[in-house]
């Protein structure tokens, strides 16, 4: 998906002769914000290990492409639809905990062990719509898909899936300043709500299920682009 969108951006960016406005905007953005979540690992015998709520600051750079719907009648003509994604992978770091001595799925005694999970966001795609309230103020709503790759280090009897896709929503608002040559600048606030996910241990120690609770947070975003 990244390669397709980048190709579209390059195509529009290299267009120097436009016979008429086509209602397309392309640009780049940077955002900084904070997300919070918690997680747990549950054993089939009812034992639960729950983490504290973790908060983390993060920053991303991305690109976007939009198309206005000015051809629609009435207030619908104030709508635009767009696609946004980060232009790089985002390292989420690692988290460790210690599992107490337990009985594995086959009844064997598992000694106390250290488990470490590393995570990296490889895609942060947003499909969204904006509504121009005025010439400079707009509202935004959309859906989010976050692709995460994880690496688990722990007991040899434990194995968790490494590729995960999380879905969520985004709501926001922003202000835009445009110039006569088509260049524009934006300031934007976004509020995210991303669904959590549960995964089952795929190793021989299959009595455990790890759960990431819902992720929530907000970001401030700046963007610059050009309208065609």
Summary of predicted features, one role per range:
Residues 19-96, 101-107, 111, 219-223, ...:
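Short glycine/proline- and aromatic-enriched beta-strand/turn motifs that initiate or cap beta-hairpins
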């Amino acid at each position: 998906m990244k390669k397709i969108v980048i190709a579209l951006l390059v195509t529009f960016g290299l267009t120097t002769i436009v016979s008429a406005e086509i209602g397309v905007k392309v640009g780049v953005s940077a955002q900084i914000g904070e997300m919070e979540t918690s997680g747990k690992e549950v054993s089939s015998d009812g034992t639960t290990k729950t983490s504290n709520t973790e908060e983390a600051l993060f920053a991303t750079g991305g690109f976007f492409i939009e198309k206005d719907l000015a051809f629609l009648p009435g207030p619908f003509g104030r709508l635009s639809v767009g696609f946004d994604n980060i232009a790089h992978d985002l390292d989420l770091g690692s988290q460790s905990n210690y599992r107490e001595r337990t009985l594995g799925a086959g009844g064997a005694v598992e000694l106390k062990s250290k488990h470490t999970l590393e995570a990296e966001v490889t895609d942060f795609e947003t499909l969204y719509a904006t509504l121009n309230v005025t010439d400079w103020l707009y509202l935004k709503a959309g859906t989010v898909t976050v692709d995460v790759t994880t690496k688990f280090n722990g007991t040899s009897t434990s194995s968790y899936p490494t590729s995960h896709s999380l879905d969520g929503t985004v709501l926001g608002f922003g202000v835009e300043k445009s110039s006569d040559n088509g260049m524009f600048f934006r300031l934007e606030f976004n509020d995210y709500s991303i669904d959590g996910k549960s995964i089952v241990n795929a190793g021989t120690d299959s009595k455990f299920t790890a759960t990431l609770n819902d992720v929530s947070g907000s970001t401030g975003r700046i963007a610059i682009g050009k309208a065609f």
